[in-house]
Amino acid sequence: MDLFDFFRDWDLEQQCHYEQDRSALKKREWERRNQEVQQEDDLFSSGFDLFGEPYKTNKGDALANRVQNTLGNYDEMKDLLTNHSNQNHLVGIPKNSVPQNPNNKNEPSFFPEQKNRIIPPHQDNTHPSAPMPPPSVVILNSTLIHSNRKSKPEWSRDSHNPSTVLASQASGQPNKMQTLTQDQSQAKLEDFFVYPAEQPQIGEAEESNPSAKEDSNPNSSGEDAFKEIFQSNSPEESEFAVQAPGSPLVASSLLAPSSGLSVQNFPPGLYCKTSMGQQKPTAYVRPMDGQDQAPDISPTLKPSIEFENSFGNLSFGTLLDGKPSAASSKTKLPKFTILQTSEVSLPSDPSCVEEILRESQHLTPGFTLQKWNDPTTRASTKMLEDDLKLSSDEDDLEPVKTLTTQCTATELYQAVEKAKPRNNPVNPPLATPQPPPAVQASGGSGSSSESESSSESDSDTESSTTDSESNEAPRVATPEPEPPSTNKWQLDKWLNKVTSQNKSFICGQNETPMETISLPPPIIQPMEVQMKVKTNASQVPAEPKERPLLSLIREKARPRPTQKIPETKALKHKLSTTSETVSQRTIGKKQPKKVEKNTSIDEFTWPKPNITSSTPKEKESVELHDPPRGRNKATAHKPAPRKEPRPNIPLAPEKKKYRGPGKIVPKSREFIETDSSTSDSNTDQEETLQIKVLPPCIISGGNTAKSKEICGASLTLSTLMSSSGSNNNLSISNEEPTFSPIPVMQTEMLSPLRDHENLKNLWVKIDLDLLSRVPGHNSLHAAPAKPDHKETATKPKRQTALTAVEKPAPKGKRKHKPTEVAEKIPEKKQRLEEATTICLLPPCISPAPPHKPPNTRENNSSRRANRRKEEKLFPPPLSPLPEDPPRRRNVSGNNGPFGQDKNIAMTGQITSTKPKRTEGKFCATFKGISVNEGDTPKKASSATITVTNTAIATATVTATAIVTTTVTATATATATTTTTTTTISTITSTITTGLMDSSHLEMTSWAALPLLSSSSTNVRRPKLTFDDSVHNADYYMQEAKKLKHKADALFEKFGKAVNYADAALSFTECGNAMERDPLEAKSPYTMYSETVELLRYAMRLKNFASPLASDGDKKLAVLCYRCLSLLYLRMFKLKKDHAMKYSRSLMEYFKQNASKVAQIPSPWVGNGKNTPSPVSLNNVSPINAMGNCNNGPVTIPQRIHHMAASHVNITSNVLRGYEHWDMADKLTRENKEFFGDLDTLMGPLTQHSSMTNLVRYVRQGLCWLRIDAHLL
């Protein structure tokens, strides 16, 4: 029938108040629809998109005219439309509806039939349910309607196509259509109840989903009841809800939700689309899920769904209380005229509508509505649920129940409990009917049935085959419309769910129990469920994230999921394709954590809830589980076994989702526990383990609060991880079904960790005590201590590794006490220092073998503590100390100097020699002073050198009696004993020799240096140990670039200049390497030339000539001048051969031209020489010469000109070199002491010094400058 003809012919005011008319119309329309759909399937199967545009886009004025005519019939609705400005929305009628309405002959009868049919269901449902919802619910619904109008239209658009697909499918298969009708009507009821405004939009969706609308007839009876409630509360609201869509279609869709005929009002084209939808399983799934299930699930739709969930649950919950009466009052539908008006446009095939309505009647309308609510609510609430999940855990769900259902929350819960027994008896009969009826029996799975009807016989076959399974699967699918793969198992789950729900609803509380199941969580559950549908997998991953190993181990240890596997295997086959959907749906059912349970258990969720219901936490799941019980009865023995394992397997659900329904079921339980345990693990890993070991009921109940709190976060995290994490987790969960072993393993793991930690703690305590007790232990003890610490350090590391491995259970971390952790940290640092010290020890100094680990720790810790204290007392910048390093080299062999030196321990020197900078040039900076700076303690540990202003007890390295003379902050010259000092000095001398031989940086023992040198300044100045190894030019180039970049990053001019000078030294070394390697592409002359420019730039940063210039600036200028001088001289030497050539060539040229020059009076002739004399140059000008010359001006060849210029440039280098040298000499007079020490240490620098000597000399001076300026 033509949809518009239907609207036109449909007299909204004419009300078919009698069930007889409805039944007759149903039958007729169903038959017609089946015929038309079958005929049109081929025609439209491939020619039309699932979701067509509004007719208006195609029809234009014609459509507008039809719509106007239709609207003209709605006298009562006009005011509402005008007032609420819904006309625009009503105008939007799906495109496909018009072209797809080729069967006009059905219009007259179809419209009245549908009208009668639609209206009575509304009235029937309205009468019982109208009184049911409190006026407040109605108000909320009306308000929601307003809010949903906006979101619903888009959703309805999406729904139109799905509904069309469903309609065609429904016509193709009456049973399916019935199921679909129930689902859609249920969804519509949800939408309607959720939001009257949404209902118009839903109406559009229903229009798109003719089957859904047909389904909505029984469901619409409940929905109509709700609408009637709205009407009773405020007729305008109900009308508004109907008209809210703003288009006749929408209005009709509103009615369609109530009577489902509006769904049939869709033209055969829509049905053909339905057939196309069949081709596209995704479309099926979406219609099944709800109006918003259109492949395009717009966020608007989801929000509207969320509103529906919250409000729809309220109204629906309210309806639940009166749903049984609503079912009985289907005959009373005539009362709800406005709803009929809104529905007028939807159904296009009266016979199909009739059949669908009948089937939907068979199915408990309330149940269908509930299912619809669940899918739509879930779909919309998935996103919200992630957010809500934090607060929408079972605790939140209960408040939400109260909020959404207000009075009905408790009623719903009670109804659920009541419905459980009823559902159990009812479900078997419903499941018992034909396989399609089994789908109907799924009732709540109407959405899945719709999608299934979209999939036509395929869905039906499987749904009938796996009624119980499909019941569970469809429910899972309901939360989210899934792609075709999910259609079958979603439908199956829906069927199973619907079956249980239908049974419960049939019992009289069937609607209420199912609604209660979804409603107890009402808003939150759908939202949470949908959020979990999205986050369920994610939640599962969330737990893995928090405790991936724990969950894996637990799930692996759990065999229970396998027990559920037999039952779930069949579902798995279907669910395998729709595993994602299942998980989502399950999530939708379950609340934050329970949703996950349900996700894995969805198929088995119903039986499981019975067990879970025992736990307070499982209250929602209990409500959900009650219908599952019905399923259990339907599925017979399978549910019961699942129930038992599920409590044990809360963790499994995450992983089960992906593995399959069977496994998912136990996992859902496990997952619930996992969530709680996860939250607990967040709180306390051990607790989570214990909780997991505890029966699931205990875990879910006891841990619910924690898990709820954590679940929110987990959900968010898990949402990210949902797909991948849930898949992996599911697999693990299956393996982990027996979580009891997991806790044991975790506990064991934790216990070792704890033991290790305790041991570490004990050691730390011992170290602290020893540090305080024995700050000056003998070096001998210290020496053994180092190796011991090494071993101990390695042991703690191993333990740490174990802890890290075991950390999947965060118990270890949580068990760490702050104090213990604090103790461990220093201990670790000490160990690291010890290890570094040992590594740094010269080959000659072998660390003493570990003798007493505790003692060693004590000695090392005390030694280190002393060092740290000393270092703290004496800041690393030791500018006063570094003066005597040069002498230290000479006196390194003298024991007395070292022993007497109060400022330094030889060990410090020895270890300091170790720390060699990669630069190799400036690496020489001693750790204590230049290298370590603020890091002296750390580097001291590595270099075992800690230089302090008053002499630091670095005493770290000793061959046998390791140094650590415990020259504490005071670092007395005797260093505890003369023997110790002697040993230290001997060792240091040996070590230094070895280090020097190995070209390691040598730290001149500052203590020894002062004795050797009369000046204390020399003693204090450290000497850099330079690496004699030869590197290629690239190595030096890299070093130079590093220093240059470092200088570029500095803002302080002096530090910048020093670093530029240091970089220039590296460039100089690079040039020197180029000289050695003739294959170098770049000329060393060029490198030197560029280095000169860099030095000159560095000198410009500080005006040493200024009266305000500091001694440091002048010292730096001296070093730069020395360097420049030698560089210039070196450049001259490199070009000396060229200069000689140029000189000879020029001399020859002048000789050849001597005769000519003699003939011409010129200054050259005046001197009688080839070279001009100053007198001749002064007396004779070129002009005079030219004037005297008859031949005219003398031309010089270009070659000679270039040669002369090159000759001048080369020879000028010598001049510059000497000039800079003289400048350096002048400035040196102002700092004789500094440069005297430098000359003494490094040897005097001359103009004939090699580039290597120059680099080392200047670098040593720069090091001292850094120390003086505290730049190290």
Curated annotation (Swiss-Prot):
Biased composition (Polar residues): 97-107, 161-183, 576-586
GO CC terms in record: nuclear speck
Keyword annotations: mRNA processing, mRNA splicing, Nucleus, Phosphoprotein, RNA-binding
GO terms for biological process, alphabetical: mRNA processing; regulation of RNA splicing; RNA splicing
Record has Phosphoprotein as a keyword: yes
GO molecular function terms attached to this record: G-quadruplex RNA binding
Protein name: AF4/FMR2 family member 2
Record organism: Pan troglodytes
